[in-house]
Amino acid sequence: MPRFSLDAVRGFDRAVYVVAAGQLLNVFGSGLVYPFATIHFHLEIGIALSLVGLGLLVKNVSTAVATTVGGYLADRIGRKPVMVAAMAGNAVTLAGYAFVPAIAAAVGPLDPAGAFIGVSALAGATNGLYTPAGQAYIADLTDGAERDRAYSLLKVGNNVGFGTGFVVGGLLYEWAEVTVFLADGATSAVVAVVLFALVPRIHAGQRDVALRDSVGDWGSAITKRRVLGLAALNLCFAVLYAQMQTTVPVVAEAELGLSSSEIGTLFVLNPLTLVLLQIPLVDAVSDWRRTRGLLFSVGFWAASMFVVWLVYLLDLGPAAAGRHPLLAAGVVLVGLHLVARTIGEVLHSPISTSLMSALGSDGERGAQLSMLEVAKRAGFGIGSFVGGVFFDYGLAAWLWPSLIGVCVVLGLGLLTFERTLSPVENGVATEG
């Protein structure tokens, strides 16, 4: 394994660093609310947990739909306008979570659950516009292995912000609960200003193309067999991703008896692992075929699901008199899950994005990356729903071997997909 140095994060265009800093701040806002949103709306506002889950599903669907629009707009009118507009919209919709009870009181037919679902739909829409435009902007400024490193830099920035948000959010939530939602919106407003002022417009879009032709180009970009194949694989990865937000916290609380503050502290392992390993690990596999890096990722995902399954196999139930050693073992297993699934995430996210970027022309890139994001959001929604079904019907112990089965399917799918790629598309440098 090559020794990591700061050279891995040097040499990018200044705009890459500005976008990375902006995403760090934006994801800091997300970290403020991530551990506490479900607690707030279920325990404090009194919305049924199933309806909170429905709101999160609606948000993911809305994000997926908006992502297709965001990718199209990124190609048609340029990356920067879409990025700025999306962040400005986020400032309003994310802050709207603080006013869910007030919205329900002001709009007669709505109860708090309906208001929560409505705000979630709007928040998903504004959030979905940003991702394909931001990823395409970075792709425009980088190529080859440099692009993998740039996406890794974004991931590190995201997770420094996310982990810091956990800590600061805990302090804010104890002081005044709704401040975490207001602060989340405020961070997006700051990012919108930073992008508008400091990021140059390097892609002017393709305004001279007729609407009918534009739609045709967009449709062609996202209906290519390999694009759809990679999107399907990404959906399966996202089903695995979703468990950290939906079912793993339930295991930690209901099975192991951890408090919300203990769960939040334990979950810091996710961003901590990302910050420590994202750039050196991706740099270490940069000479591999991209599909082999993704296979390596699948191995860690499978291991992460297995260690949670052990909580059930070893009957590490809620703490009771005399069961403290078993409780400690259960906490270690959940911690191992978080570390292993995060290593899987470290490898998957930048490599899959680079692979999709390599499958089309510059004009198709925004739409293709939007397809990747749509698949991820769909997988999040499916993973959350399916995980909830297993728990609701008393089959929680069987969720984890089922997810290991998903990992097996992913591995076979990647080996099949690899056969369709040229060496250059798969990240292998050729001499010439």
Residue map of PLM features:
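Residue-level signature of mid-helix packing/kink "hotspots" within the transmembrane helices
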Residues: 60-68, 162-163, 271-279, 380-381
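Helix-to-loop junctions at the C-terminal end of transmembrane segments
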Residues: 66-78, 277-290, 391
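Short amphipathic helix-loop junctions that connect adjacent transmembrane helices
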Residues: 35-50, 246-262
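Juxtamembrane intracellular "pre-TM" segments in multi-pass secondary transporters
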Residues: 1-13, 200-233, 432
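Cytoplasmic helix-loop-helix junction between adjacent transmembrane helices
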Residues: 119-160
